[in-house]
UniProtKB/Swiss-Prot annotation:
Coiled coil: none annotated. This is Ly6/PLAUR domain-containing protein 8. Residues 125-176 form the UPAR/Ly6 domain. Expressed in the large intestine. Preferentially expressed on the epithelial layer exposed to the lumen (at protein level). The gene is LYPD8. InterPro entries: CNF-like_PLA2_Inhibitor. The keyword Lipoprotein applies. Belongs to the CNF-like-inhibitor family. Keywords: Cell membrane, Glycoprotein, GPI-anchor, Lipoprotein, Membrane, Secreted, Signal.
Amino acid sequence: MKGILVAGITAVLVAAVESLSCVQCNSWEKSCVNSIASECPSHANTSCISSSASSSLETPVRLYQNMFCSAENCSEETHITAFTVHVSAEEHFHFVSQCCQGKECSNTSDALDPPLKNVSSNAECPACYESNGTSCHGKPWKCYEEEQCVFLVAELKNDIESKSLVLKGCSNVSNATCQFLSGENKTLGGVIFRKFECANVNSLTPTSAPTTSHNVGSKASLYLLALASLLLRGLLP
């Protein structure tokens, strides 16, 4: 009897030590920064997930945060995925997601973008956005260095409503993230990416301007110079 009691107490203590607490918050517009962590359910007691999406676009998706407990194993102790898509100099969409193995995540706003580099003169991507739909018609936008073209369709939702975003532009997204999200209906940090396509701008060859008129003009200029030379020779004694 005593042995059974000791074993029971030990099991309770081990369970208490292994329990995980995460911030559990899903919000539009309001920040989850001041939310308090609470104990995770037994079926999602492996890691904490924290994701946020913010934009300066004229769409319903201005600020979205989703923090929850997960049964997922992180690829690292703390794995952060972050990228920004630029549509213009003033318009952008920023996404960051953390997977924190066995511990609470830090504020996702700490994962800031690296400083932007110079604009690459040969790198252009179609840039546009829509609140709904499956595509948008973009105008060319010059990318910063180390950016690539991105076309994504994302669905962000909570228990009450769902909002969609269609986006094309220049992004600093990594090739690993492109590969992971490529295809359809991939979920990262609670956000469903219905479509995520990347194109390396370095592989794009700029369209060459027609040279016909330039060549004709050059030949005409040479002909006039030769004719003028002959006339001058005939007039001189």
